[in-house]
Amino acid sequence: VLQAVFPDATVVVTHRDPVAVIQSAMTMLAYGQRLNRHRVDIKSLAEYWPDRIEHLLRRCVETRKLLPESSSMDSTFHEFMADDMAMVEKIYAKAGLELTKQARAEMQQFIDEHPRGKHGQVQYNLKEDFGIDPAVLRERFRFYFDAFPVKAEAK
């Protein structure tokens, strides 16, 4: 459908360690529940989110090959985090777009003014906070790590 509506679009498929995605999402949702519930339902979060992410990623692995190589690319989180401007350049090149000096300067200004960790970092612990062993979860998602060059982040 996307290609029918936007035939000249370039699709960038992003990839990240699903264990890191799950711990981040569950932590954010648990914090949100603390605002409007008497009790955070940790068990429900721990049961639902790994299943949901697995379903989504299995579909991603199955359907990624349907996107034409000429108008799609994969972007890993670790590549983006290592050098965000290099990833922007790759995306522009894949899309056949010119990355103007002005656009580059404005993006670099934003990056410089919003450094990662500026406001601290969330400390995650899947085992202690949610009773989930990251190694078990990582093995569950082996199919995804095998399909895409994703680096493990979560410990």
Task: Locate predicted features.
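ATP-dependent NMP and nucleoside kinases share a basic, alpha-helical "lid"
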Residues: 1-15
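PAPS-dependent sulfotransferases, especially Golgi type II membrane carbohydrate sulfotransferases
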Residues: 5, 22-74, 78-155
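Sensor-1/coupling segment of RecA-like P-loop NTPase cores
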Residues: 18-19
